[in-house]
Amino acid sequence: MLADSLVEEFEIREDEPWYDQQDLQQDLHLAAELGKTLLDRNTELEESLQQMYATNQEQLQEIEYLTKQVELLRQMNDQHAKVYEQLDVTARELEDTNQKLVAESRASQQKILSLTETIENLQTHVDDLQRQVEELKKSGRGRMNHERSDQPRSMHSFSCLKELYDLRQYFVYDHVFAEKITSMDSQLNPLEEENENLKKAVTVLQAQLTLEKEKRVTMEEEYSLVVKENCDLEQRLVDIDLYRARAEELEVEVAEMRQMLQSENTIHSAEKLVPESFFISFKESLERELGQSPADDGLLTVPELDKKALKRSSSENFLSSAAGGDILRGHEETCIRRAEAVKQRGISVLNEVDAQYNALKVKYEELLKKCQIDEDSLKHKAVQTLKQYSKDSVGNTQYDLSANNQEFTNAGELLSSTNTLPEYKALFKEIFSCIKKTKEEIDEHRSKYKSLSSQP
């Protein structure tokens, strides 16, 4: 456009007459230089424009790249948000599990406390029973064993009490640890640190769970063993009570027999019994008289008996009398003599029975002491098995308990055999049967004598 304007000016100036040729050349030269400079400037502007286009495209590419990076960052942020949500969920679950574990630890601690209380109650019960056994042992020994010193009752404690208290301490520590875990800061740490902390917490909790399960299993095994041993001890104590009741029954029977003997002795001394041999001889003489006179239908009078002879119990001489008065006087004299003999004989029988009773009583006390010694030894063995109990020697303790049970059953069989066949009982039975027979025979002879004497 500048060149066209210059050409027009040049044409106008040619028309004018005052236009100089030199000036025209100079103007042309200047115009050429100006056009050249303008062309250079135009090329520079075009190059700068192209550079601007290139930079613009580069910036557009950078913008696209940055938008892609922003999208990737948004995706990463979303993923991180999801991970944070999952971590929050896992943290809540872990807190819930921690609370459950704390509750379970408290429940197990309460259970252990209740078990310790029951064990202590059982221990006190066993101690009371041991005291009763020792008191019975002391009362049973009596005057025979004053020289022997009573063995002091050893206080036996269960070996598992220490482990129970240790477990209580461990459970308290677990409870504190769980409270520390639940009271952790809720601030969001970096992902790696949080993951590592959570993994460590999970491993610690799993280890504590395994330890608690193992301790619970061991405690249940120990509790079952203690329950079995306590059941065995209670059964033995029941057997001891049965033996004691049996012994009291035997003592009551002996006292009743003694009272019966005393009552029989008082009755015999009051009635002044005639010896059995006299009445037997009198019975034989009466039967002989009745056999010789069958035509009279067994009716005899006292004068008819005056002609017969009576046999004495002390000798085999015959007594002949002529009158009924002589017979009666002789009969009274013999009754008096026989009453004195019966008194002496009853005293001697009582002395013999008393001696036999004392011997049987001594024998019975010895058997009772022997049974009590066996029971005490079994009781001490059973309690020592509790003290010597350990996890590695469960089989040995069971073997000892079975051996103790066998010894206890043997002792019970021995005591039952002694209770089923007592010798003094048979002796007293024979004595009472003899006394009853003699009494019946005496009553029969007396009734016959009264019937004969009452006849006219």
UniProtKB/Swiss-Prot annotation:
**Coiled-coil segments, which residues?**
38-142, 178-268, 348-376
Is this entry keyworded Lipid metabolism? no
Q: Which UniProt keywords apply?
A: Coiled coil
Coiled coil keyword on record: yes
Q: Could you name the domain of life of the organism this protein comes from?
A: Eukaryota
Please tell me one Gene Ontology term that the record gives under cellular component.
Answer: cytoplasm
Family, similarity comment: Belongs to the CDR2 family.
Q: What is this protein called?
A: Cerebellar degeneration-related protein 2
Show the taxonomic lineage: Eukaryota, Metazoa, Chordata, Craniata, Vertebrata
